[in-house]
Amino acid sequence: MDPTYERIYAAVARIPRGRVATYGEVAAAAGLPGRARQVGYALHSLPAGRPVPWHRVVNARGEISPRAEPRFGTIQRKLLEREGVAFDASGRVSLARFGGAVRRAKGRGR
């Protein structure tokens, strides 16, 4: 497995239940500032059955990012709602209330 993707998956795994993080926050927490798109690529490549809470990652506007397969957006929203994450009428999560949940791992000196 790509070591960069492993760092991303480890950062996503640190997002607590009922909280979200943006692609950019995950990138920074993985020691990859400015590489939000790489987080998207890594999550798209997540092996089936790998216990990484991919559904807790949203875009910088607090929205579920569009996907080639729309049903995954529906699944993501349902998973977040089951964890107590609320969406407004525009389909956004309040990042002030539910965001900022991922931190950089200790010992990462990059």
Where are these regions (language model features)?
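Nucleic acid-binding interface residues in structured DNA/RNA-binding domains
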Residues: 1-110
